[in-house]
């Protein structure tokens, strides 16, 4: 059967305009992404948009908020065993900030963590090229926004982060309380492959010389849980200068998308102390 030529009664098929949003990316792995704005930067509107779209695309987003230092961001990425870091920087110090972050990750054995940045017109094209040549995974420009759209940029970012940080066949690592990277890997192994490591965990707990006390805190959203925990951390660190403490935070996974917002770190100012280990987890159900 012949196809009629385009006319008023038979218009030509519509085509997607250049830069139109792409179908949402479907990750193969559980992607964990740390989001923040850079130090001395209160412009957080854009990072909020990006972390919401990333969450809606299936990522588990650990949001730190604005005015975060390189060390705070790197500490969070290591403790959370994240595949990527997304930071907006509008304060003019992006060249030093992103390079310092890249170097610190490598020094601490986390060079696999992808760094993504953006800063509108503040970051010049030649600076973007230099940062990406240095090892920053991608710095998105206004031209990228026009060409890819918001969803397209998120798809590109998550696609670069869609890899496993641990392998199912790995043995549960031995670690000490101050080895946050090994501890984070152990939690990821148990979280991703619980059946394989359940017996090992139970044996280690049974053989432990000291069983620390465990305090559970729960409540409705906005009840002040994170603020209360931050105050407990502050007092603990002051009263017990030789002891360490760990905080495990659990937030719900969105059933429709599989993503989650893990935002408890925003209110925990004392969590930046090296004697504190924080891990955010999604229910994944």
Kindly give the residue locations of the regions a language model identified.
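Non-catalytic signal-transmission and effector/linker regions of two-component phosphorelay proteins
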Residues: 1-4, 17, 21-31
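Extreme N-terminal, non-catalytic leader segments
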Residues: 5-6, 150-213
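A short, charged/proline- and glycine-enriched loop
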Residues: 27-33, 210-213
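Cofactor-cradling patches in redox/metallo enzymes
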Residues: 40, 47-57, 61-152
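ATP-binding Walker
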Residues: 41, 220-223
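Nucleotide-state-sensitive switch-loop elements of NTP-binding domains
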Residues: 191-212, 223, 229-285
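Hydrophobic anchor at the beta1->P-loop junction of P-loop NTPases
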Residues: 215-217
């Amino acid at each position: 059967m012949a196809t009629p030529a385009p006319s008023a009664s038979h218009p030509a098929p519509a085509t997607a305009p250049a830069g139109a949003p792409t179908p949402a990316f479907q990750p193969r792995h559980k992607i964990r992404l740390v989001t923040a704005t850079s130090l001395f930067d209160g412009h957080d509107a854009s990072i909020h948009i990006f972390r919401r779209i990333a969450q809606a695309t299936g990522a588990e987003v650990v949001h730190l908020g604005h005015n975060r230092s390189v060390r705070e961001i790197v500490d969070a990425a290591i403790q959370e065993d994240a595949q990527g870091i997304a930071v907006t920087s509008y304060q003019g110090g992006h060249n030093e900030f992103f390079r310092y972050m890249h170097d610190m990750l490598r020094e601490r054995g986390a060079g696999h963590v992808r760094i993504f940045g953006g800063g509108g017109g503040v970051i010049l094209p030649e600076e973007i090229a230099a940062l990406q040549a240095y090892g920053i995974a991608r710095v998105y420009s206004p031209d990228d926004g026009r060409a890819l759209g918001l969803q397209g940029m998120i798809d590109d970012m998550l696609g670069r982060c869609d890899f496993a940080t641990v392998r199912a066949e790995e043995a549960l690592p031995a670690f000490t309380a101050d080895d946050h990277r090994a501890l984070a890997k152990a939690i990821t192994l148990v979280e991703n492959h619980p059946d394989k490591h359940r017996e090992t965990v139970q044996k280690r707990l049974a053989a432990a010389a000291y069983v620390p006390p465990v305090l559970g805190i729960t409540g409705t959203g906005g009840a002040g849980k994170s603020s209360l925990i931050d105050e407990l951390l502050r007092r603990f660190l002051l009263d017990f200068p030789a002891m360490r403490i760990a905080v495990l935070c659990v937030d719900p996974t969105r059933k429709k998308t599989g993503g989650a917002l893990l935002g408890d770190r925003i209110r925990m100012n004392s969590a930046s102390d090296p004697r504190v280990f924080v891990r955010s987890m999604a229910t994944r159900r």
